[in-house]
């Protein structure tokens, strides 16, 4: 899915949500910025976020390892979904829960991401998955909620659209609003269960649209930029999200 901002206007609600979540506000790696250390592997989006939300609680990358200690998150963070790019469009996904101050591994899954791999210079239509740390939001899907799912999980149908204007999920019974009709039959399998990762919530022109964590299908080996994992594991992550709710669940994406 790709995002277009009409007339270059930013969405106020998304701006506030971005500031509240403070995704990848300050990024450092062994005393230097990840932008300096990982210029090839990349974290440009996180560096841009630093300029936008300076002074808020920070999500910091400390060391080049997928140990969750690498990611220093706001105190309110209780769930971390770490996406490790393993070459091309393949990835490993690890979901951790913070229990008594210690990150515990709860879910692991193979997965796939953008057809052109990971990028620190993502732009609309390039089929890459952005690198960075983001605050997850908006759980939804074509299937009914399971016990333990977030209370704000939305079962979507064809009247729901991921809006091109607001970059959020909206009800549009008129069918006139521009965007992706996420509840249509063609998304069965893919969008059975979904969480928005929180990428480009400010609607920066040209950066691309929503970054979804959604279900993988057997006939695909890559996406347009989203991260796809096994449906069973997707449901487990939704239950972790449900235990804490909005603002407590983060996604971190980077190459191995």
Region roles according to the model:
Residues 1-53:
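Gram-positive cell-envelope targeting signals
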Residues 55-223, 234-245, 249-256:
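Cell wall/extracellular polymer interaction/catalysis modules
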Residues 226:
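Short cysteine clusters
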Residues 229:
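A conserved hydrophobic position in a structured secondary element of the catalytic/binding core
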């Amino acid at each position: 899915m790709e995002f277009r901002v009409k007339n270059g206007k930013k969405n106020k609600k998304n701006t506030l949500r971005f500031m509240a979540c403070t995704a990848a506000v300050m990024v450092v790696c062994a005393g230097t910025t990840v932008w300096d250390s990982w210029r090839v592997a990349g974290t440009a989006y996180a560096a841009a976020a630093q300029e936008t939300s300076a002074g808020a609680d920070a999500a910091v990358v400390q060391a080049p390892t997928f140990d969750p200690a690498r990611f220093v998150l706001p105190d309110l963070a209780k769930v971390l979904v770490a996406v490790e790019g393993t070459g091309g469009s393949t990835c490993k996904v690890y979901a951790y829960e913070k229990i008594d101050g210690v990150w515990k591994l709860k879910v692991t899954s193979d997965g796939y991401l953008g057809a052109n791999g990971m990028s620190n210079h993502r732009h609309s239509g390039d089929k890459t998955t952005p690198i960075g740390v983001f605050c997850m939001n908006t759980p939804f899907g074509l299937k009914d909620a399971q016990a333990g799912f977030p209370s704000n999980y939305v079962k979507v149908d064809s009247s729901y659209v991921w809006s091109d204007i607001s970059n959020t999920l909206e009800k549009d019974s008129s069918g006139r609003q521009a965007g992706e009709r996420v509840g249509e039959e063609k998304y069965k399998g893919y969008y059975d269960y979904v969480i928005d990762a929180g990428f480009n919530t400010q609607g920066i022109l040209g950066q691309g649209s929503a970054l979804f964590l959604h279900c993988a299908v057997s006939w695909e080996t890559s996406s347009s930029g989203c991260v796809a994992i096994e449906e069973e594991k997707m449901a487990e992550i939704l239950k972790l999200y449900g235990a804490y709710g909005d603002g407590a669940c983060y996604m971190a994406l980077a190459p191995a």
